[in-house]
């Protein structure tokens, strides 16, 4: 009857409300915990800077000294408060167990061919870092690099992996303790034996090989002392020839005030014909230069001399270059130009901008 149905509906709503209140109670941390937190007192210094005649106080300048005992003590005190709160959250274990269950499945990347081997990344489910495997001629897979074994505490990670033209040599960068300052290790890709001393003090860098002779990488002059907070605003592009000491690496770009950029990257085209150099002063917008690697001592030729767009090389076919750009095209387009006259006035649309984002 209608009355019976109505009573059943009301009973269902009542049970639902009780369950929601129960779940809310279980999922909400105790409010008393947050009200009882005693935050460490942060000392205020007396540093004052003057910019354009105006005095600007900077009372926490002392925290920029990341190597000082006082800063270390401040960090320990902050961590004690933070983890003191996090550790008492009643449903923290439930969250961890749920995430563990969701993440616990095998993950395998797309394969890629280098030399005589086919490489791929694999994670058995709960490994902190993906492992690099390889196979040869359909044989059994073997581990090539396992970043989980790079350090005892597991804080050293694999950042970049790149192979020489014939796949016989590999260069990979590692980050220790989460630092942006990295080392590049060079190994025989067949035997996995280290070939030379690692390159050190490398930061915000890719690895782009020129044939089998060496590779381009980027870094800053490493500051002394406060590595974690010192200003790094002049990136430099170098070429490392295999067998040479790092101090002999050739500076390609970024060494002068006119070439000053916060970020500089170098990319060698697949046919080893051109080096493409991209420079940025922020995280958006880049200028662009090109160098013919087949001509000894060839000059750097400007493609773009401003930062009004994000423009990147897709590929080249002989001397014809293909760029993806948003220059005067917010939805992006693909343009083509000959490397002999690569400036923007010579660009031709290959795929024009449309109402859809490319």
Regions of interest found by a model, annotated:
Residues 5-8, 17-358:
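Beta-propeller folds
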């Amino acid at each position: 009857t209608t009355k019976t149905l109505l009573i059943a509906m009301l009973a269902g709503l009542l049970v639902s409300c009780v369950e929601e209140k129960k779940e809310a109670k279980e999922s909400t941390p105790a409010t008393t915990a947050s009200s009882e937190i005693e935050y460490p007192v942060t000392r205020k210094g007396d540093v004052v800077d003057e910019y354009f005649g105006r005095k600007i106080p900077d009372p926490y300048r002392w925290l920029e000294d990341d190597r000082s005992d006082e800063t270390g003590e401040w960090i320990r005190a902050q961590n004690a408060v933070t983890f003191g709160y996090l550790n008492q959250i009643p449903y923290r274990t439930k969250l961890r167990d749920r995430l563990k269950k969701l993440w616990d499945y095998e993950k395998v990347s797309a394969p890629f061919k280098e030399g005589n081997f086919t490489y791929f990344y694999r994670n058995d489910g709960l490994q902190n870092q993906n492992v690099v495997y390889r196979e040869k001629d359909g044989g059994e897979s073997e581990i090539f690099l396992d970043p989980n074994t790079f350090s005892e505490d597991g804080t050293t990670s694999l950042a970049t992996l790149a192979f020489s033209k014939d796949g016989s040599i590999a260069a990979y960068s590692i980050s220790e303790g989460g630092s942006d300052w990295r080392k590049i290790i060079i190994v025989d890709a067949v035997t996995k034996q280290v070939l030379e001393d690692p390159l050190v003090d490398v930061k915000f860098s890719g690895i782009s090989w020129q044939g089998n002779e060496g590779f381009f990488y980027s870094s800053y002059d490493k500051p002394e002392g406060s590595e974690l907070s010192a200003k790094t605003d002049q990136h430099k592009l170098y070429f490392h020839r295999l067998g040479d000491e790092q101090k002999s690496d050739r500076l390609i770009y970024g060494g002068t005030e006119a070439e000053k950029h916060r970020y500089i990257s170098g990319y060698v085209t697949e046919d080893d014909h051109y080096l493409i150099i991209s420079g940025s002063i922020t995280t958006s917008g880049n200028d662009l230069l090109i160098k013919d690697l087949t001509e000894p001592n060839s000059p750097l030729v400007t493609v773009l001399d401003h930062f009004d767009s994000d423009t990147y090389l897709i590929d080249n076919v002989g001397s014809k270059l293909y760029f993806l750009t948003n220059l005067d095209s917010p939805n992006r387009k693909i343009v083509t130009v000959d490397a002999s006259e690569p400036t923007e006035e010579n660009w031709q649309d290959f795929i024009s901008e449309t109402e859809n984002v490319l």
